[in-house]
Every structure is written in C-alpha cells, then in structure tokens.
Amino acid sequence: PEVFLAAQRAIYQGLSLSAVQITGENIRINLGQVLKGKALRLLEPIFICGQITLEKNDLQGSLRSSLLASGLKDLLALLLEANKFTNPHQMLENYDITWEEVEFTQDQVSLKGSLKDEREEISAIYLSTGLNLIDKQILALNPLKVEAKPEHLNFSLTDFQVDLGEEVEINHLSLDSTQLCCHGKLTVKPD
C-alpha cells in the first residue's frame, strides 16, 4: 500500500511549511489487531519520499515552536561540544534563548535572538551558517559562527558536519534568499 500527501501552507507541531509532498510506501499495520481494540503498530518499515519547501516567512513564523526551539538548543549544544565546551547541555540550562529573527541569503542562514541568563540579564545571540550537503546523510554547516554575550559563547567552526542518520537520505538541498528546499527519503521503523 502507498499513500500520497500534498499540502500548501501546512503547520506541523508549530512548524510552518510552504509546500510538502510526500509518498509513503510499504505501509503494513496490524489492522486485524486494531479492529480487536489493540494499539496500532507498524509491521514493517515505511519508506517515505518527499519534497519540503520552507520559505523565510515560514521559518520566521516557526521560531516560537517548541519543536524548533528544542532542535536549535540541541544544535547549539552540539556546536559547543565541538568547540571543546564541557557539559554543554548543562551550560545551556542556565540560559533562556528566544530566537526572534531569521534571514536567508544565498547559501547562508542567520538567526538572531535574545539570551536571558540566570540573573535575568538579556543580551543578543547570533548564529549564522552555510548549508552544504556532503553526501545523502551528512550535512555540513560551514562556515559557522555564534556571537553572544557572555563572550565565552562566541566561537566559529569550519566544516562542522551533522550525521543525519541511516534512516535519512537527502538527494537535494538548496537555499537562496527566499527559501530552503529539500528532496529526500526517510525510513520510519517499527518499534
């Protein structure tokens, strides 16, 4: 069985997407058990192919999403760890980060926000990076720069790579001054 889904201006857990087109293949569930009142379960992995377009305004509108905020905080922790900070997750617990503005340029994403420390003092934080696909599962953030007060959070990294995992296969990634577009595949495995 196969399912095709297409949407314009979709919102998923607070994330706004300009356009989404996905196809799910090999969908096998425990329908017989579901009809008997049991929980729905996947019987085999589902292979999802799709294209997602995210315009600058979509990302701007998604900045308050808890899903995006959590992902950005996790990314910042990875970046701090790569820059030899110890206990980056614990360090970030001392700050409340609110992302307020996003900017797309050719091959560059920039985020501007505010950083509130435990004394309730507020300062600015900036994160900017280029996005390059190294292979189907590795995304390079290069060059990457974080500027913040306190100054110990200021750093730059070159060629920082994010392994997206074996379940992800990105075939195309493009970024210009108006949108980010991604084509790829995802495998959803049963529990």
Feature names for model-found ranges:
Residues 1-191:
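Extracellular/lumenal and peripheral-membrane lipid-interaction modules
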